[in-house]
């Protein structure tokens, strides 16, 4: 992989990470087209994706810097220094607990099924296309049944747990981490913007942990040129990711996610046609 390819993949990562259309699906499609996904070492591609996600995580930290700082300081004050009972804590401190609670399922499943996630099965276009369609339809259903009444201040532990388990489904390529969590948030009655904001905050622990872990393990097989490519891709994903967050939050204040539903189903259908008609894998 050269720097230009890395920049293009970083751009794709940043543009698709926060839209509910699956960054993994688009990156894997682009990677296969470029010929940089190794059939002999699929774990190298998994590591590349996980590490450049640190760029999009940086975008979340920068965009939500005030929220993250407020949650962190309030959480420390009310839990460490004042040692308040949970029911007496502010919604800001409780939100910190909800992010922790919602992160536990994906941390557990991610470690248990790490080998499967890194294997060739998760690079299969059949798996990716099926996930695009199935989870796209679920997103469409959530738009129909959602009440759109719950703000960020009204999120409960049950909401956090449901969205957290939905994040586990994002381990399936093509599902989309933002897609599954926003879908779950809508099913739980959140407004579209609230579902997206909580989804983005929930991404911080999961993406940081997986990215740093994969980066540590990738040191065993990366050369100096690989580091330059990785750094370029990560920086590009941070810039494009920041712009995508700003766009999506504005978009969801006035529009539904139906355009993404249609896109997912059409893309998934096209991929299935390519697989069965032309034998593309």
UniProtKB/Swiss-Prot annotation:
What membrane topology was assigned to this protein in its record?
Multi-pass membrane protein
Q: In which compartments does the protein localize?
A: Cell inner membrane
Q: What class of enzyme is it?
A: hydrolase
Tell me which EC number(s) this protein carries.
Answer: 3.6.1.27
GO aspect biological process, one term: response to antibiotic
| GO molecular function (one) | undecaprenyl-diphosphatase activity
Assigned protein family: Belongs to the UppP family.
Coiled-coil region: none
| Alphabetical keyword list | Antibiotic resistance, Cell inner membrane, Cell membrane, Cell shape, Cell wall biogenesis/degradation, Hydrolase, Membrane, Peptidoglycan synthesis, Transmembrane, Transmembrane helix
Q: Which GO terms describe its cellular component?
A: plasma membrane
* Reaction(s) the record says it catalyses: di-trans,octa-cis-undecaprenyl diphosphate + H2O = di-trans,octa-cis-undecaprenyl phosphate + phosphate + H(+)
Instruction: Name the chain's protein.
Output: Undecaprenyl-diphosphatase
Known function? Catalyzes the dephosphorylation of undecaprenyl diphosphate (UPP). Confers resistance to bacitracin.
Give the miscellaneous note: Bacitracin is thought to be involved in the inhibition of peptidoglycan synthesis by sequestering undecaprenyl diphosphate, thereby reducing the pool of lipid carrier available.
Pfam hit, one: BacA
- Looking at the UniProt entry, the stretches that span the membrane are 1-21, 45-65, 93-113, 125-145, 155-175, 195-215, 227-247, 256-276
PANTHER family the record matches: UNDECAPRENYL-DIPHOSPHATASE
Entry-linked InterPro entries: UppP
Question: Which cysteines are disulphide-bonded?
Answer: none
What species was this sequence derived from? Syntrophobacter fumaroxidans (strain DSM 10017 / MPOB)
Keyword Transmembrane appears in the UniProt entry? yes
């Amino acid at each position: 992989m050269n720097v230009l390819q890395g920049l293009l993949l970083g751009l794709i990562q940043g543009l698709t990470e926060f839209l509910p259309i699956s960054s993994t699906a688009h990156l894997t499609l682009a990677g296969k087209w470029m010929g940089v996904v190794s059939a002999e070492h699929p774990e190298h591609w998994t590591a590349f994706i996980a590490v450049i996600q640190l760029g999009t995580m940086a975008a979340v930290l920068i965009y939500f810097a005030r929220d993250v700082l407020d949650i962190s300081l309030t959480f420390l004050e009310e839990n460490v220094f004042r040692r308040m009972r949970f029911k007496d804590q502010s919604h800001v401190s409780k939100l910190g607990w909800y992010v922790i609670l919602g992160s536990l399922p994906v941390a557990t499943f991610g470690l248990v099924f790490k080998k499967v996630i890194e294997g060739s099965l998760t690079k299969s276009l059949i798996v990716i296309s099926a996930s695009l369609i199935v989870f796209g339809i679920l997103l469409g259903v959530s738009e129909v049944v959602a009440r759109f009444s719950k703000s960020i201040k009204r999120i409960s532990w049950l909401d956090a747990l449901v969205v957290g388990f939905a994040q586990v489904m994002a381990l399936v390529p093509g599902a989309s981490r933002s897609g599954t969590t926003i879908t779950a948030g809508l099913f739980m009655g959140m407004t579209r913007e609230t579902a997206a904001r909580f989804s983005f905050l929930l991404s911080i622990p999961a993406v940081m942990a997986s990215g740093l872990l994969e980066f540590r393990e990738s040191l065993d097989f990366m050369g100096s040129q690989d580091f330059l490519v990785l750094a370029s891709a990560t920086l590009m994903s941070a810039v494009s990711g920041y712009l995508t967050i700003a766009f999506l939050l504005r978009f969801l204040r006035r529009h539904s996610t139906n355009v993404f539903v249609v896109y997912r189903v059409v893309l998934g259908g096209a991929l299935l046609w390519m697989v069965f008609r032309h034998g593309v894998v």
